């Protein structure tokens, strides 16, 4: 993240979920340089295996993100936070979504999580790395530190609005280990290899907004 961002946020939490993938090595470019042409997602997109990245308030640009195209995805749950940006990163297919929309215009309490995840899936995302800029009361966390969390505490009252289950569909997701450990360890090894200040393990507490 940029120094200006770092002065506002105590730590950056990286949330990993789903399957694993080999670590990537970024090089040069940014979503701001993406083509302005809008592409509508097609059935072919679902056949492309992609790494999904959801950027929070501290991540809008990714170095080395090439061949960029903004894509519009229709979902049965309404509109996602923004168009999704597809491209390649170190030779791998990637799809990026700015969680709060370009220009940071959507409050955390207004996010349409179901539409966001559905859109990611429709564009072939098999793994998702979600990045959030957060604060902490623990002194060991410094500005711009990365915390690879391994647990959640959900203190919101709106989880029923964000589930794919209900209305005749019953599902139970185990929450003992909500983060993909294999993917988390790959991210940890990659961060250490790059000599990035990273913390192994942590709990993300999600509070009720708006904030």
Predicted regions and their residues:
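Intrinsic low-complexity, disordered N-terminal segments enriched in polar/charged/small residues
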Residues: 10-11, 25, 35
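Short alpha-helix boundary/capping segments
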Residues: 28-39, 69
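Metabolite-binding pocket within alpha/beta catalytic cores that recognizes anionic/polar moieties
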Residues: 43-175
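Active-site rim beta-loop-alpha module in soluble metabolic enzymes
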Residues: 178-211
């Amino acid at each position: 993240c940029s120094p200006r961002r770092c002065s506002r946020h105590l730590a950056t939490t990286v949330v990993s979920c789903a399957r694993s993938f080999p670590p990537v090595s970024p090089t040069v470019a940014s979503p701001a340089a993406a083509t302005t042409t809008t592409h509508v997602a097609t059935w072919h997109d679902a056949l492309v295996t992609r790494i999904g990245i959801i950027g929070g308030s501290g991540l809008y640009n990714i170095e080395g993100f090439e061949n960029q195209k903004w894509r519009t995805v229709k979902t049965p749950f309404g509109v996602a936070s923004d168009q999704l940006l597809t491209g390649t990163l170190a030779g791998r297919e990637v799809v990026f979504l700015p969680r709060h929309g370009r220009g940071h215009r959507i409050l955390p309490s207004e996010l349409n999580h179901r539409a966001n995840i559905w859109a990611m899936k429709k564009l072939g995302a098999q793994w998702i790395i979600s990045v959030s800029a957060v604060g902490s009361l623990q002194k060991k966390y410094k500005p711009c530190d990365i915390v690879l969390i391994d647990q959640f505490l959900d203190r919101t009252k709106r989880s029923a609005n964000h589930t794919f289950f209900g209305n005749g569909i019953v599902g139970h997701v185990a929450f003992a280990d909500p983060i993909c450990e294999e993917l988390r360890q790959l991210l940890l090894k990659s961060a250490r290899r790059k000599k990035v200040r990273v913390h192994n393990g942590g709990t993300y507490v999600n509070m009720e907004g708006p904030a």
